[in-house]
Amino acid sequence: MVPLNQAFLISPSAPYGEFSIPPSKSHSLRAILFASLSKGTSIINNSLSSPDTDTMLSACKKFGARITRVGETLHIQGNPPPYSQYSSHHFHMGNSGIALRFLTALSSLSPSPILITGAHTLKRRPIEPLLSSLEQLGSEIRQKKSSSIPFVIRGPISSGHVTISGQDSQYASALAITAAVAPHPLSFSIENLKERPWFDLTLDWLHSLNISFSREQDSLFFPGAQSIKSFSYSVPGDYSSAAFLAALGLLSSSSNPTVLYNLPSKDPQGDKQLFSLLKSLGADIVIEKDHIEIRPSSFSGGVIDMDPFIDALPILAVLCCFAKNPSHLYNALGARDKESNRIEAIAHELRKMGGSVHPTQDGLYIEPSRLHGAVVHSHNDHRIAMALAVAGVHASSGQTLLCNTQCVNKSFPHFVIAAQTLHANIRHHQADFSLRSSLCR
């Protein structure tokens, strides 16, 4: 059994080298879901294997999809809606915000009640704006507690138009996916859309699957009664995961470059824009057709709109500690409602390491700082954990003990192996468990 407070021990080092970035979590989850909604058998190569993808696979099986894995390939025989029979009427969403939002919306197509639950940590992920829109379309929602899980949803929804909050792009993506396969016309308008690149990623998928819809600014219309044909797809590398390895190389005292492969330059992932931002701030980054080369270099801070790559807030906060001048990260209010309150969490932990990091309502103000080793905590958030690991590698002195690191499996299960391949001194902590428990409280 994996200990609940698994830890990393990190020492200052000078990373460099080459690594092929693991599959994108966002693409993997969408590929699994769309294949499960399709007619026929779809083939998905190089899907990420993680707790979130396991949650999506389990839920899609309950919706009637038949899924087998052959090596690194998934074979998915879809079961398009309308849904009438299930292997279970209880859907456990684990700790996956995407599974919670996307599958809740799809459950609104069912005439039978479905119980939606999840890990206790999922209760911090807002769902009320989506539930409200589904109720307006005719869904019955029962057993709501504090606007979160658990709840029971029963459809089917009817044709209509709703307005959905854009504070989290997953609400709009969930409605778009549901409208794409609904039997009746559906339309919706998005109010103040945030994280726009991630909503555009969903629309890019719908275009590739030949789903028809019209769009006027942030209002969309779906004609209904459409179907998804089976497809073959190879999942590209994850730009969000690549950001952590890129930061290892960018801040390195080595004279050697870091080269990251499996990153198609034309892929629409939102966090891809982070690399262009760093380049504009002076970082020595070369973006090629299928890889990115990062050379150790200095770069400026700045006033940075985080909305296009809000998930990169933790690692960008670390990078800004090493910038030549202060930085102000703003327009990241949604970062407070991720796996942790990322604004408060990363500020709190970096201050333990000597960082001058100050939370604002929607972001951070960061002054250049010399970091030192410390005992820090992941807040059970994979992106906080990996950002702090990078900070520990580039601390000016002392080791860093990073606690509760099992959360890294959510998006980058082999993060330590990747870091070690790049000559970063990060290892699973092997000290006495009782001592580790005391330190990691």
From Swiss-Prot:
The family database entries (InterPro entries) matched by this protein are listed as: Enolpyruvate_Tfrase_dom, Enolpyruvate_Tfrase_sf, EPSP_synthase, EPSP_synthase_CS, RNA3'P_cycl/enolpyr_Trfase_a/b
Show the active-site residues: 311
Q: In which pathway does it act?
A: Metabolic intermediate biosynthesis; chorismate biosynthesis; chorismate from D-erythrose 4-phosphate and phosphoenolpyruvate: step 6/7
A Pfam family annotated for this chain is EPSP_synthase
Q: What class of enzyme is it?
A: transferase
Question: What GO molecular function annotation could you give as one example from this UniProt entry?
Answer: 3-phosphoshikimate 1-carboxyvinyltransferase activity
Identify the GO cellular component terms for this protein.
cytoplasm
| Residues noted as binding phosphoenolpyruvate in the record, renumbered to the chain | 25, 97, 125, 170, 342, 383, 410
Top-rank taxon of the source lineage equals Bacteria
Look up keyword tRNA processing and say if it applies.
no
> Which residues are noted in the entry as 3-phosphoshikimate-binding?
25-26, 30, 169-170, 311, 338
EC?
A: 2.5.1.19
Which one GO biological process term can you cite for this protein?
A: aromatic amino acid family biosynthetic process
The yes or no answer to whether the keyword Signal is present is no
SUPFAM superfamilies xref list: EPT/RTPC-like
The reactions it catalyses are: 3-phosphoshikimate + phosphoenolpyruvate = 5-O-(1-carboxyvinyl)-3-phosphoshikimate + phosphate
Q: Where is the signal peptide?
A: none
The places in or outside the cell where this protein is found are: Cytoplasm
Enumerate the transmembrane spans: none
Q: Which family does it belong to?
A: Belongs to the EPSP synthase family.
Q: How does the record describe its quaternary structure?
A: Monomer.
- What function is annotated for this protein? Catalyzes the transfer of the enolpyruvyl moiety of phosphoenolpyruvate (PEP) to the 5-hydroxyl of shikimate-3-phosphate (S3P) to produce enolpyruvyl shikimate-3-phosphate and inorganic phosphate.
Quote the protein name from its UniProt record: 3-phosphoshikimate 1-carboxyvinyltransferase
Name the species this protein comes from.
Chlamydia muridarum (strain MoPn / Nigg)
